[in-house]
């Protein structure tokens, strides 16, 4: 297939590609900057098919580097800038990285690497840029967030990114006014997929270095934004500071990282906020199941239906299985994990769920998070949904605690509001949950451990509290 950026420049050179810190740049301007960077990377020895790690931020330079590495045909290992030096070191070694490119403010996180400052001082050398891409080639590698066990390197091909973008546009549509606000990390699939969609669709990315709800609200009210990707915690922060709807041009608020609560859904409906819930993974190159706004209140808790042409089914043990061209070919240098993740061509998500009579998917739990108490299956998310309805709770996570009598019992960790009253919460639980599902212990914490994408890391809670 033709090189996406080069093709986009030929199609719409003067259209806006990137808006960062108020400055607009066209696809033509971005392409020229990318070529210059590619020449510098080439001069530093980076070649086609080499594994190159990128440790950056949500900024213009990192944005350009992602494109530059693709132009050279290198495979980009995206490093999470929130990781420790030790965690990063594991990924670099496991991926057998040839080069590391690192933002100046993050150089202490790696033993050695090419800093952005070094790049700026490097002389240009005419690079060998790829005019076409083999869709089966690896474009990127992202290590799983480690919600269970050691992180694994997820290989994402150009075909994976292409079909993810195609599936999304077939579902959400495309207009001349479209633009995508990216306040999620571009080292994560939710952010990188926005960049890929920008080039394939020919729409601008409004890139934000951090999620600032005040600034994001201003952008959503400006008329410049049509789509934004958020996780639940981001959405709740937006709803808290803004009591109305947004500009009519905002047509999609794409929610990932778990379904919204009934309270959030009702607020969005009252305020005419077009919330689109979705389910996706690093292994599926972003969303692969989506629930449109019209079904949100009728299908509370559902992630929706599989996007075209993906398929979803439920295994005999309740595990969600997926099939489609956006799904990873496997894990880097990990044949055992790859083989264990596929059965008859279907990808095993590790999530438990079900399909209702109309084919809507409901994700219940990670298999590893399931609590089995006295032979009863307890799904932490069910308890969390009940607890989160209480206005005194900001955030909640439920895990299983070993118990001599029952094997395991649920316990809750809560980030509380000032109005929190445990007695009131227990009454709510007793009214809405079977006795064995009621948390046997409630612990108030300042914050919950999360991945870069905003998913709560229950395994970290278990480690911290020796459960």
UniProtKB/Swiss-Prot annotation:
<dbReference type="InterPro" id="IPR000873">
    <property type="entry name" value="AMP-dep_synth/lig_dom"/>
</dbReference>
<dbReference type="InterPro" id="IPR042099">
    <property type="entry name" value="ANL_N_sf"/>
</dbReference>
<keyword id="KW-0067">ATP-binding</keyword>
<comment type="function">
    <text>Converts 2-succinylbenzoate (OSB) to 2-succinylbenzoyl-CoA (OSB-CoA).</text>
</comment>
<dbReference type="GO" id="GO:0005524">
    <property type="term" value="F:ATP binding"/>
</dbReference>
<dbReference type="GO" id="GO:0008756">
    <property type="term" value="F:o-succinylbenzoate-CoA ligase activity"/>
</dbReference>
<comment type="pathway">
    <text>Quinol/quinone metabolism; 1,4-dihydroxy-2-naphthoate biosynthesis; 1,4-dihydroxy-2-naphthoate from chorismate: step 5/7.</text>
</comment>
<dbReference type="InterPro" id="IPR010192">
    <property type="entry name" value="MenE"/>
</dbReference>
<dbReference type="InterPro" id="IPR020845">
    <property type="entry name" value="AMP-binding_CS"/>
</dbReference>
<keyword id="KW-0436">Ligase</keyword>
<keyword id="KW-0474">Menaquinone biosynthesis</keyword>
<keyword id="KW-0547">Nucleotide-binding</keyword>
<dbReference type="InterPro" id="IPR025110">
    <property type="entry name" value="AMP-bd_C"/>
</dbReference>
<dbReference type="Pfam" id="PF00501">
    <property type="entry name" value="AMP-binding"/>
</dbReference>
<dbReference type="GO" id="GO:0009234">
    <property type="term" value="P:menaquinone biosynthetic process"/>
</dbReference>
<dbReference type="GO" id="GO:0031956">
    <property type="term" value="F:medium-chain fatty acid-CoA ligase activity"/>
</dbReference>
<dbReference type="Pfam" id="PF13193">
    <property type="entry name" value="AMP-binding_C"/>
</dbReference>
<protein>
    <recommendedName>
        <fullName>2-succinylbenzoate--CoA ligase</fullName>
        <ecNumber>6.2.1.26</ecNumber>
    </recommendedName>
</protein>
<dbReference type="InterPro" id="IPR045851">
    <property type="entry name" value="AMP-bd_C_sf"/>
</dbReference>
<dbReference type="GO" id="GO:0006631">
    <property type="term" value="P:fatty acid metabolic process"/>
</dbReference>
<comment type="pathway">
    <text>Quinol/quinone metabolism; menaquinone biosynthesis.</text>
</comment>
<comment type="similarity">
    <text>Belongs to the ATP-dependent AMP-binding enzyme family. MenE subfamily.</text>
</comment>
């Amino acid at each position: 297939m033709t090189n996406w950026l080069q093709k986009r420049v030929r199609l719409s050179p003067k259209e806006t590609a990137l808006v960062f810190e108020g400055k607009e740049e066209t696809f033509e301007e971005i392409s020229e900057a990318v070529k210059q960077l590619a020449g510098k990377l080439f001069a530093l020895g980076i070649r086609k098919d080499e594994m190159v790690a990128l440790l950056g931020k949500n900024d213009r330079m990192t944005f350009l580097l992602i494109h530059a590495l693709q132009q050279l045909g290198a495979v980009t290992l995206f490093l999470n800038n929130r990781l420790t030096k030790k965690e990063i070191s594991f990924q670099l070694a496991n991926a057998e990285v040839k080069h590391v490119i690192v933002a100046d403010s993050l150089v202490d996180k790696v033993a050695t690497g090419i800093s952005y400052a070094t790049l700026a001082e490097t002389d240009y050398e005419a690079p060998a840029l790829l005019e076409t891409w083999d869709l089966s080639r690896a474009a990127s590698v992202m290590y799983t967030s480690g919600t269970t066990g050691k992180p694994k390197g997820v290989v994402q091909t150009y075909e994976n990114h292409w079909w993810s973008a195609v599936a999304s546009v077939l579902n959400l549509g495309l207009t001349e006014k479209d633009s995508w606000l990216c306040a999620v990390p571009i080292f994560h699939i939710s952010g990188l997929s926005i960049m890929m969609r920008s080039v394939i669709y020919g729409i601008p990315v409004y890139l934000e270095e951090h999620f600032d709800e005040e600034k994001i609200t201003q952008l959503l009210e400006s008329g410049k934004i049509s789509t934004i990707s958020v996780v639940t915690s981001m959405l709740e922060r937006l709803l808290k500071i803004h009591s109305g709807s947004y500009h009519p041009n905002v047509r999609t608020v794409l929610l990932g990282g778990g379904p919204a609560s009934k309270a959030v859904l009702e607020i969005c409906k009252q305020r005419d906020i077009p919330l689109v819930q979705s389910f996706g993974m690093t292994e599926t190159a972003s969303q692969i199941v989506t629930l449109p706004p019209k079904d949100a209140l009728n299908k509370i808790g559902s992630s929706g239906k599989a996007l075209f042409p993906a398929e979803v089914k439920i295994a005999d043990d309740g595990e969600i299985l997926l099939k489609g061209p956006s799904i990873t070919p496997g894990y880097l240098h990990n044949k055992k994990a790859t083989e264990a993740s596929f059965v008859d061509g279907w990808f095993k998500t590790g999530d438990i769920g079900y399909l209702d009579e109309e084919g809507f998917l409901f994700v219940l739990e990670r298999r590893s998070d399931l609590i089995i108490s006295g032979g009863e299956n307890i799904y932490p998310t069910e308890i969390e949904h009940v607890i989160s309805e209480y206005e005194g709770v900001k955030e909640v996570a439920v895990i299983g605690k070993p118990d001599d009598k029952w094997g395991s019992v649920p316990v809750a960790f809560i980030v509380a509001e000032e109005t929190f009253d445990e007695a009131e919460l227990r009454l709510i639980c007793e009214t809405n949950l079977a006795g064995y599902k009621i948390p046997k212990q409630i612990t108030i914490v300042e914050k919950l451990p999360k991945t870069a994408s905003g998913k709560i890391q229950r395994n970290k809670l278990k480690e911290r509290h020796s459960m």
